[in-house]
Amino acid sequence: MTKPKQYREIIDALVNACVAGQGHIAVNRVRAGVWNAAATANSMPQEHAANVLLKRLSPTERETLAYLLASEFRGGVFETLQALEAARIEPFQDGYEGGPHHDLIGRLGGWQWPGN
C-alpha cells in the first residue's frame, strides 16, 4: 500500500506537535514549576492558583503531572485520527499499520515509514 505524501506529512506534523510543539507547552510549564509567570491572584486567579500548586509539588510529582498532560494531548490526537478514519476522510480511511492512529503511535515510538 502506498499513501499520499500528504498523509505522511500530516502524521509527522502531529507527532511533532506531540513531542515538541503544542503538546509540550503545558508539559514544559509543569516541569519548570511555573504555569504563567505574569499571573497574579487578581489578574489571572486560575493561572496564579496553578503557579501556587506547581510550586508545592516536588520535581518527581511535577514530572508525573507532565507525563499525564503529555498523554492526554497524545490521546486527543489519537482520537481525532480515529474519527477521521471512521468518517472515511481522505487520506485517513486506513493506515500502513492498521489505522492512522496506529501509524501515529508507531511514529511516536520511532517506527520508520515503509520504503524509507
Which stretches of residues belong to each language-model region?
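N-terminal low-complexity, intrinsically disordered segments
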Residues: 1-59, 82, 86, 91-94
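Alpha-helical protein-protein interaction elements
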Residues: 6, 27, 65, 103-105
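Surface-exposed, polar/charged faces of alpha-helical domains
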Residues: 59-60, 64, 71, 75
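Amphipathic alpha-helical binding modules
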Residues: 75-116
